[in-house]
Swiss-Prot record:
The keyword NAD does not apply. It comes from Thermoplasma volcanium (strain ATCC 51530 / DSM 4299 / JCM 9571 / NBRC 15438 / GSS1). One of its GO terms (biological process) is translation. Part of the 50S ribosomal subunit. Contacts the 5S and 23S rRNAs. One of its GO terms (molecular function) is 5S rRNA binding. This is Large ribosomal subunit protein uL18.
Length: 160
């Protein structure tokens, strides 16, 4: 009998084992129907220990009152996760996307760009990130001004 999470299609145990054998902390990205969740976790015998968690709803703490899972929100969640990870003492991590497929220029790639821009070192190729036009929201009706949002993050970092 297979594990329940494998039968339900929730966990790829082969991929999880490879990630855990690396003994690096994991940057976990989960895209939901209405939002995005980013976490930094490390393995523990008693269960994974979550060091930092950021969702699209938590961006209001940084002065961004938008929710969703578009490309810009994913970038900002990744950036915020990087800020929180550095507060927790995390300098390097590996990307954990679960059973999702990684698409070049997609939402997970935008989240990855956000965390690398914040200063956390995650192995990646430079060609996987979204175009700057898409990241700046030129394809959206009401784009977020990313430069202003990142400045808000930096101001809050200096205050803390």
């Amino acid at each position: 009998m297979a594990f329940k999470r494998k039968v339900l299609g929730k966990t790829d145990y082969g991929r999880r084992l490879r990630l855990l054998k690396s003994k690096d902390r994991r940057f976990i990205v989960r895209i939901t129907n209405k939002g995005i969740i980013a976490q930094i976790a490390e393995y523990s015998v008693n269960g994974d220990r979550i060091l930092a968690t950021i969702t699209d709803k938590a961006l209001s703490k940084y002065g961004i009152e938008l929710r969703g899972n578009n490309l810009q929100i994913c970038y900002l969640v990744g950036y915020a996760a990087g800020v929180e990870a550095q507060k927790a003492g995390v300098e390097t991590a590996v990307l954990d996307i679960g059973r999702k497929k990684f698409r070049k220029g997609g939402r997970i790639a935008a989240c990855l760009k956000g965390i690398t821009d914040s200063g956390v070192d995650i192995p990646h190729g430079e060609d996987v990130f979204p175009d700057k036009k898409r990241l700046n929201g030129s394809h959206l009706k009401n784009p977020v001004k990313l430069n202003e949002a990142v400045k808000n993050f930096k101001k809050l970092e200096e205050k803390a």
